């Protein structure tokens, strides 16, 4: 993270020792080991900061992502994707920050639409995407799951996958990386993280890339 953005989080004047420690760790250790593309790194960090509710750090990272040329649509898609995994109550501050900063950078809102489904096909297309990423077992869950699970399973296909995973703006590999960082940063979601680790491997994010994503998130989530 560049000096001016780090200083928005930690005052070099008031807390010079912590500033130096964090700056050294980020620049000499974490960034030096970076295996991700610029876009991947920023999307991973932004997603982790949403997951851990790191509002001040998110704003600083967002400034840096915009200056580094990350596509605003990709940033917006990461924020929208977070709605499925964090819930509306936790993503609103980040949505508002992203909108405000994009306008600061001269962008006109709303950005071009990226949705590909409608009321009639969101369930079917979402279920197809689920099966594509996680296997035929996802289809069986719609008919064979215990009755109390049926609503949640249907919503998972229609909303999480039909409304979000089918969108343009991020490819499957980027979207799975974003999702894993959102889950990782919340803590206590190991079962979900295992499932999405398999999902990442299935879309071509190999073990080295997943380790790289965790490394870039680590300074922000511990």
Model segments located where?
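Acidic, glycine/proline-rich low-complexity segments that act as flexible tails and inter-domain linkers
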Residues: 1-39, 51-52, 56-63, 67, ...
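Short, structured motif recognition centered on aromatic/hydrophobic residues
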Residues: 40-49, 78-79, 175-184, 213-217
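Alpha-helical bundle segments that constitute or directly flank the non-heme di-iron/ferroxidase center
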Residues: 45-56, 188
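Winged helix-turn-helix DNA-binding recognition segment
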Residues: 70-74
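Substrate/cofactor-recognition hotspot
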Residues: 77, 83-89
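Glycine/small-residue-rich hydrophobic helix-like segments
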Residues: 171-208
């Amino acid at each position: 993270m560049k000096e001016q953005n780090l200083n928005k989080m930690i005052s070099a004047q008031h807390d010079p020792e912590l500033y130096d420690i964090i700056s050294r760790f980020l620049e000499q250790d974490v960034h030096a080991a970076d295996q991700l593309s610029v876009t991947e790194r920023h999307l991973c960090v932004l997603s982790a900061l949403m997951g851990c509710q790191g509002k001040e750090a998110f704003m600083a990272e967002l400034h840096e992502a915009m200056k580094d040329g990350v596509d605003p649509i990709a940033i917006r898609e990461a924020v929208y994707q977070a709605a499925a995994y964090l819930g509306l109550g936790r993503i609103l501050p980040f949505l508002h920050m992203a909108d405000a900063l994009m306008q600061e950078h001269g962008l006109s809102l709303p950005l071009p639409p990226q949705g590909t489904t409608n009321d009639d096909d969101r369930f079917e297309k979402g279920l197809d995407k689920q099966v594509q990423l996680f296997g035929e077992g996802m289809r069986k869950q719609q008919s064979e799951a215990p009755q109390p699970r049926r609503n949640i399973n249907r919503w998972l296909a229609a909303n999480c996958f039909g409304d979000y995973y089918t969108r343009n703006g991020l490819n499957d590999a980027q979207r799975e990386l974003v999702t894993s960082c959102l889950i990782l940063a919340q803590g206590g979601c190991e079962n979900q993280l295992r499932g999405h680790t398999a999902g990442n491997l299935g879309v071509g994010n190999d073990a080295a890339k997943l380790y790289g994503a965790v490394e870039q998130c680590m300074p922000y989530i511990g």
